[in-house]
Amino acid sequence: MNIQYDKSKIESTLKETSIDDSDLSNVVYLVEDPHTAENFDEISKQIAAKVRMGHKPRSCDALYRSGKYYNLIEFKNRKSADLRIGNEMVELHEKAFDSLGQLAIYLNYQNSLDNLAKETRLVVVYNDGKGAEEATSDIAS
C-alpha cells in the first residue's frame, strides 16, 4: 500500500510528542528531549483517512528511529503503578498491536510482521510524580 503522507504534520520532536494537554490549565511535557521523532498519532490519522477506516485505530504517541530499531513510544502522565490498574495493560497491549500494523503500512514493510516486531521496541514513559523537568530520555543512546 503506497500512501502519500503529509510529512510536515508528522515531523516532530520527542518533547512535542510527549505533551499532555488534556488539562489546558496544566500542560505537561513528560520529556524535554529535543531529538527528532515522528508523531505516530498523526501517522495513524493519515493512514485511517487514506484507507477509509471508520475509526482511527489505537496508536502510540511517537516513532523514534534508533540504530536498527523502531521505537514506538507511549507517554503516560501517571504513575507506573496506575498502569497495572483495570484495563490499562490490556489497552497498552492493544495499542502496541495496532501500532505495529500501522508501522508496517507506514514503512511499506515487505517482510512479515514477525520480522518487524523483532526490529521494534515499545517504550512506555510514565510520570511517577516527578516534574517534567526531571524526566529524562536515554533512547537516543
Segments from the language model and where they lie:
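Conserved catalytic cores of phosphodiester-cleaving nucleases, focusing on short active-site segments
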Residues: 62-64, 69-77, 99
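Catalytic cores of nucleic-acid endonucleases
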Residues: 78-132
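Polybasic (Lys/Arg-rich)
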Residues: 136-141
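Catalytic micro-motifs at enzyme active sites that drive phosphoryl/nucleotidyl and oxygen chemistry
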Residues: 51-52, 61, 109-113
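Beta-rich catalytic cores
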Residues: 58
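Glutamate identity and glutamate-enriched acidic tracts
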Residues: 11, 16, 32, 38, ...
